[in-house]
Amino acid sequence: VILGMVKNINIDYISGTSSGSIVATLYSIGYSPSEIYNFFKHYSKDITHIGFKNIFKLISGLLLKHKIIIDGLNDGKKLEKIMYKICAKKDIYTIDQINLPLLIPSVNIENGETYIFTSKKIRNVYQDNYVYDNSILVSKAVRASCSFPGIYSPCHYQNKILVDGGIRENIPWKGTKKLGANTVLSIIFERTLEPDPFLDILEIITKSINLLSHELSLYEQSGSDYVLKINTLNTSLLDISKIDFLYNLGYSSMNNFLEKNNWNKKLCKFE
């Protein structure tokens, strides 16, 4: 998607939720679309790896204590370490060091507050149940936004327990406009849910969250100026074998969208 955009339009603002926060962050600190693609090719197995240790803890907890004693199948620490290393190569550590306006949402699971991590300061308005922060480590912000419930453990930050931003801000157009964007293009990835009587625990979790995110997206997209929906067919959250397919699908979908709207290097401010 990013590759199709940079060839045709100027991206002046960028935001991303969950795995989209990885793409948004890498682009905002200067990595090219091809470098972002190579990042996912190289690190996807590490990011999505579910270790034997967590599986053992899950099983032993169920057998011995008759309860679930883990808060996720992946603790998220590997993702945070990888992002820290990748950002350090650009001499970027905290989010306020990023020049391109960037926004990454997460959710405080304890009280439902939406935590918005931004590279530019936004004044907190307490009535809207949002908390803005521009001092967090970039790697920590990405980990928080990617903490998909049940798959990744929640991220602890300043005595808060943060999880995937997609729970409340699947399309973060509000914060992007608060950063200063006049025109927002939102990218929505939709998955075709096919009947399957043999679902494992991961599929049950991911399909449940996907359904929730889909309904939330329908509600939220009205605030975006433009919306591009991309159907990823039956590709699951952890299916890293489909990276090439998704890369090409995103590129062709964006090109078709831009051609349909007759855009060619327009000076626009896009999410």
Q: What do the predicted segments below correspond to?
A:
Residues 1-17, 25-271:
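Patatin-like phospholipase
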